[in-house]
Amino acid sequence: MGVQVETISSGDGRTFPKRGQTCVVHYTGMLEDGKKFDSSRDRNKPFKFTLGKQEVIRGWEEGVAQMSVGQRAKLIISPDYAYGATGHPGIIPPHATLVFDVELLKLE
């Protein structure tokens, strides 16, 4: 499946991230059953990553690249685009499909 992007609210429709740019996002990560495992919103601190540098899972690389600044979307990410057969011990089980509520705040 890879990554499926479902828009929650639209962005500007013009400003999309490019490789090498820093994406500033707020996110909430959940398992398929809705159990939250991480949230930048709870920490009240946006998360930053550089697109194309493999600092995040493949589902984020491909999903966030399809979003425009200001957009909020649900990213549904299959295990092969997330943490695969290993999972993330104690947090994400093996072969888990993940759901992220991601808002692309700005690009740097």
Curated annotation (Swiss-Prot):
Ways its activity is controlled: Inhibited by both FK506 and rapamycin.
Family: Belongs to the FKBP-type PPIase family. FKBP1 subfamily.
Entry comment describing in which tissues the protein is expressed: Ubiquitous.
Membrane topology value: Peripheral membrane protein
Biological process annotations from GO: amyloid fibril formation; cytokine-mediated signaling pathway; heart morphogenesis; heart trabecula formation; muscle contraction; negative regulation of activin receptor signaling pathway; negative regulation of transforming growth factor beta receptor signaling pathway; regulation of amyloid precursor protein catabolic process
Main location (coarse class): cytoplasm
Residue numbers of N6-acetyllysine PTMs: 53
Naturally occurring in which organism (per UniProt): Rattus norvegicus
EC category: isomerase
N6-succinyllysine PTM sites in chain numbering: 53
Its biological purpose: Keeps in an inactive conformation TGFBR1, the TGF-beta type I serine/threonine kinase receptor, preventing TGF-beta receptor activation in absence of ligand. Recruits SMAD7 to ACVR1B which prevents the association of SMAD2 and SMAD3 with the activin receptor complex, thereby blocking the activin signal. May modulate the RYR1 calcium channel activity. PPIases accelerate the folding of proteins. It catalyzes the cis-trans isomerization of proline imidic peptide bonds in oligopeptides.
EC code(s) of this entry: 5.2.1.8
Protein name: Peptidyl-prolyl cis-trans isomerase FKBP1A
Cited InterPro entries: FKBP-type_PPIase, PPIase_dom_sf, PPIase_FKBP_dom
Subunit relationships: Interacts with TGFBR1; prevents TGFBR1 phosphorylation by TGFBR2 and stabilizes it in the inactive conformation. Interacts with ACVR1B and SMAD7. Identified in a complex composed of RYR1, PDE4D, PKA, FKBP1A and protein phosphatase 1 (PP1). Interacts directly with RYR2. Interacts directly with RYR3. Interacts directly with RYR1. Interacts with GLMN; rapamycin and FK506 abolish the interaction with GLMN in a dose dependent manner.
Species classification: Eukaryota, Metazoa, Chordata, Craniata, Vertebrata
